[in-house]
Structure formats: C-alpha cells, structure tokens
Amino acid sequence: MIFVDACFGKETEYTPVWMMRQAGRYLPEYMEVRRKIGNFLDMTRNPEVVAEVTIQPIDILDVDAAILFSDILNLPMEMGLPLRFEKGVGPVFDKTIDTEEDIEALDSSADEKLEYVYKGVKLIRERLPEEKALIGFAGSPWTIATYMVEGRGSKQYAKIKKMVYSNPMMLHRLLAFNTKETIEYLSKQIDAGANAVMVFDSWGGALEKEKFFEFSWNYMKEIAKNIKAKYPHIPVILFSKGVGLYMDEMDGEFDVVGVDWATPIDHALRIFKDNYTLQGNMEPTRLYSKTATKEAVEKIAGIMKGHRHIFNLGHGILPDVPVENAKYFVNLCKELTRRG
C-alpha cells in the first residue's frame, strides 16, 4: 500500500494523497445517503452506511487512503454522555463532566459498545481495493475532554481551562480515562482491519505551550506508544491543530505528523527533518480555485521533494467545494510527484 509505505518513509511511485473530511457534504453521493438516513449520528451507527460513504471518495477521487466515516464524539457518547447535534451549534452534550463523581460514573466499557464501528471497518476493508489503505481514528483525550466538560464547541474553553489551573488533578484523571478508552478503541479498529490510525487533536492549540504538553501531547504520546508496542506494522498519525510554534518539543513513538495550514511546511520540515513523515498541508479554501490549488501543490511538492511526505489539506475539505476541484487536487498531487 503506497500510503502505508509513505507513512514509514519508504520510497513510493508518487506522493500519496487523501483529504480530511473527504467522505462528506461536498459529494452529491454522500448527500443522497444522508437524505435517506436523515440523521448524521444514525449514519455513523449503521455499518452498511459507514462502509458506503467511507468508500465514496476512493471511487470518485481515487485518493490513496480511505478514512473511516465516524465522529470523534461517538466514544464519549458511549461512555454515557448522550449526544445530539443542534442546527447552527453542532454537537451538544446536555450532561457534562463537572465533578469527580461524574468521572466515576463514566462507562469504562465504552469501547465494547462501539461494535457498529468495528463492523463498519470490517466491511470497508472487505470492499476496498487491496492497494488502498483504511485509516481508523479517534479524537485526542484533550479534545474529547473539551466537549465532555464544555458540553459543546467553544471559542474560549473557559470551563475546561479553569480546570487546567484550579483542579488539574481531576482533569488528569479524566484524560487518563479517555486515554485508556482510546487505546482500546483504536486497537479494536486495527483488529477489525484498519491499516493505520490517526489521533485528531482539534483543540490542542487552545492551550499555552507548557500546558499543551502536560494536558494534550503527553496523552497522545501514550496512545501512540501503546499502539506501536502492540502493532508495530501499523502507522500512527498524530495531528494537533494550531501548535506550529510548539513543534520544536514534539517527539514520541509515532510515524506521521499532521501539519495544519497555518504552519509553513518548511518550518515543520526543519524541525522534524526525516524522522517522521509530514502530512499536509494545503489551505482548504484554495480548493475553490484551480489556480490557487496548483500554486500551493507546486510549492509544497517543491519543498517536500526527496523528503517523507503525504499530501493532504491543512484541515477538512469544505462542504461547498466543487467535486471537480477536489479531483484536480488529487490528480495534480500525483502528477507533480511521480518519480522516474
């Protein structure tokens, strides 16, 4: 698999490419399925639907890896926090973590309740072309905790950051719980057929540098270490958004570093050299323009020539991007990096 080879820094025919949120609303085929099912959460809990929409970008765009169609909040939902999606707001937990007792009440067998995810993974792997990789994923312990404590997305993260400074021991307890459950969750995705796993730390950048390492990165490292010990042949991808200035202190037993669009990829390359594969990092809104896309792909390909790299966006693809432009991006990445 070209994607797995690139994760491990092996020479490949061209630089593999996929996109975050590639199974999503910009695809008419996805929207058709969503109209039929009606509810996003119900889609994530239906293995047949999960398999269908995960494979759509492979069939339509010919990306080199499929990423499991799911949500990072399915895990805390199965821990016992009822989840709903509110129009104009996004995910909402009406029950939040406010006390030690709330942590005590969380279900420590949440990973066992996610059988619908593992069934989806198994179906996808059975139906995917052999050469295409399947990426399993989870949210980082910190990012999941922000939703569990705040109850929804936030701009200030005041509630959880208050915990950082006034009750760090309680927060560490929650993060340790999330870490244990995430290791189990990712392990079962691998057992079901995932060829790589990725940890998404969407809100790591909400923390100052010292606290980022204490409350986010160290737990992500723990997940990577455990997965690599059990599954050395499985690549582990870590992606923290908004932490470009913290990269100089990042290390650990993982294979790929996701680079967001606000971090120049040459900055990441100077820090990580070829110790890890870099994944990213075109600004997603460039996809509205083929000219802007070409400019960015040429620049990134030039910087990363001869280095460990996987093409991706620096964040998720947006819902109103023309499919034709997404295809153009994928084809261009392959064309400009083809060796020999």
UniProtKB/Swiss-Prot annotation:
Q: In which pathway does it act?
A: Porphyrin-containing compound metabolism; protoporphyrin-IX biosynthesis; coproporphyrinogen-III from 5-aminolevulinate: step 4/4
What's the protein here called? Answer: Uroporphyrinogen decarboxylase
The entry's cellular-component GO terms read: cytosol
Its chief place of residence is: cytoplasm
- Whether Amino-acid biosynthesis counts among this entry's keywords is no
Q: Per its database record, what is this protein's job? A: Catalyzes the decarboxylation of four acetate groups of uroporphyrinogen-III to yield coproporphyrinogen-III.
Supply the Pfam families for this chain.
URO-D
Q: Which organism is it from?
A: Nautilia profundicola (strain ATCC BAA-1463 / DSM 18972 / AmH)
Kindly indicate whether the keyword Lyase belongs to this entry: yes
